Swiss-Prot record:
GO terms for cellular component: ribonucleoprotein complex; ribosome. CDD domains: Ribosomal_L20 (cd07026). Belongs to the bacterial ribosomal protein bL20 family. GO terms for biological process: ribosomal large subunit assembly; translation. It comes from Chlamydia trachomatis serovar L2 (strain ATCC VR-902B / DSM 19102 / 434/Bu). Pfam families: Ribosomal_L20. InterPro entries: Ribosomal_bL20 (IPR005813), RIBOSOMAL_L20_CS (IPR049946), Ribosomal_protein_bL20_C (IPR035566). The lineage of its organism: Bacteria, Pseudomonadati, Chlamydiota, Chlamydiia, Chlamydiales. This is Large ribosomal subunit protein bL20. PROSITE patterns: RIBOSOMAL_L20 (PS00937). It comes from the Bacteria. Binds directly to 23S ribosomal RNA and is necessary for the in vitro assembly process of the 50S ribosomal subunit. It is not involved in the protein synthesizing functions of that subunit.
């Protein structure tokens, strides 16, 4: 009976890891054992940061909205509260894009929010 070796599978596994380690520095690029641990670590960081990216973008949008709303005499929290009271359903990403690319449109939205806040205080 022929002796079955795992050479084809082993070689393809090593090639896959070394291919993923392309761009790494020193032994981490060309030596399988070093590459394997570095690739696993890189993949773990990649997974974490894919999750973090969502919150990072939300923070960016909020920062942009805070700056844009202060130009119109509102803080970020008062802008969001006013939008909710006015029944304007725009998410933070869309508002942020609007503040950058369509300042006149954002001014209209901010004015609506301000009017809704004033109406809530009076009524």
């Amino acid at each position: 009976m022929v002796r079955a070796t795992g050479s084809v599978a082993s070689r393809s596994r090593r090639k896959r890891v070394l291919k993923q380690a392309k761009g790494f520095w020193g032994d981490r690029k060309g030596h399988f054992r070093q590459s394997r641990s570095s690739v696993m670590r890189a993949m773990a960081f990649n997974y974490m940061h894919r999750k973090d990216r969502k919150g990072d973008f939300r923070s960016l949008w909020i920062t942009r909205l805070n700056v844009a709303s202060r130009i119109h005499g509102l803080s970020y929290s008062r802008l969001i509260n006013g939008l909710k009271q006015a029944g304007i359903h725009l998410n933070r990403k869309m508002l942020s894009e609007m503040a950058i690319h369509d300042p006149q449109g954002f001014a209209v939205v901010a004015t609506q929010a301000k009017l809704a806040l004033e109406a809530a205080v009076q009524g």
